[in-house]
Amino acid sequence: MKTFELNNKQTIQAVGFGVFMIPNDGPTYDATLAALKAGYRHIDTAAGYCNESDVGKAIKDSGIDRSEIFITSKLWLQDYGYENAKKGIETSMKLLGVDYIDLYLLHQPYGDYLGAWKALEEAYQAGKIKSIGISNITVNLWNKFKDGMTVMPAVNQVEFNPFVQQKELRKVMAENNIRLEAWYPLGHGNKDLLENETIVSLAKKYHKNAGQIILRWIYQEGVISLPKSTNEERMKGNIDIFDFELTDEEMKAMQALDTNKPSHNPEDPANETRLMGLKIHD
């Protein structure tokens, strides 16, 4: 598996396995174990997904040394604020059954964000978290929060695919040496994306499927991707992208597909109200 280097010199696998919306108590365990067997070594979960325990069990039962697996999790809004965040980090570690987490993110940009960030910084300095990062942060939100941060985020996980290329955000993140990480890299099954003429023609040329062309393009853009699937053949296919390379002209053709229309706007007050109301524990 190819890797990228983060701004703290830690390496991260270029393609990770996402477990968003896969249920706990069995399905996430099975999917994670299958992904590890397929060759993934980067698993992306979150407190808000309510499946950290299944991820932890699968990693333990895989027989693969913990040092070879990169675990990402995220703090949910309910546990923002300095003291709550410290407890939330410990809860994630307990559910995952680990004594450190490779990458821990603030999942959404609301509430007592900087209080939670301070707790992440302290956990990072203590070695409980190897890298810390942000998620769903726009340029405006970055400008709002950045001056309250002592440790620079290693990653910003956002919606990213050929239709949502985040060009302004990528420029600002690059200026701060923050690596972009893609959720919905395949557009959450968007037929318009997967059946796009440019992508389909490249798939035919390289004897790949549309998803593999997209994931290869994301890799060549220097962005980490987190495809999700419970289908074992598709899992394998999503990391079978390192035996070909898109040309400069093909990269430009993919870049021309940008619509700049994300599925939701993190700056929308209605989005903030909805997410702040979601509770994951008593």
Residue spans for each PLM region:
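Acidic-and-aromatic substrate-binding clefts and catalytic sites of carbohydrate-active enzymes
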Residues: 22-26, 44-54, 78-83, 109-114, ...
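Alpha-helical scaffolding within the catalytic cores
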Residues: 1-4, 53-60, 89-91, 139-142, ...
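Beta/alpha (TIM)-barrel catalytic core signal, keyed to glycine-rich beta->alpha loops juxtaposed to Asp/Glu
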Residues: 108-282
